[in-house]
């Protein structure tokens, strides 16, 4: 997947990375490379957490269980 991120230099010199498409998905790093590495981890964690919420909601509402099919 491709996500657009913004990078801004904070007053303390750290680089703040944010993924506007994913509310609250923000990270930082000492330099641009570290900030980008960290925001990739944050995006992965954000997507996983949202997936878990969706799975729980489906199971509670319908008694269904999701399965994963690799294509």
Model-derived features: where do they sit?
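Short aromatic-glycine-(Arg/Gly/Cys) micro-motifs in beta-strand/loop hairpins
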Residues: 8-22
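A short, exposed loop/beta-hairpin motif centered on an aromatic-Gly-Thr core
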Residues: 23-32
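Functionally engaged cysteine thiol sites
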Residues: 19, 25, 46
């Amino acid at each position: 997947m491709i996500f657009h991120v913004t990078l801004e230099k904070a007053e303390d010199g750290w680089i703040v990375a944010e993924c506007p498409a994913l509310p609250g998905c923000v990270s930082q790093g000492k330099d641009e490379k570290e900030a980008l590495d960290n925001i990739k981890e944050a995006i992965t964690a954000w997507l996983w957490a949202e997936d878990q919420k969706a799975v729980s909601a489906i199971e509670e509402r319908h008694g269904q269980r999701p399965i994963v099919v690799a294509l």
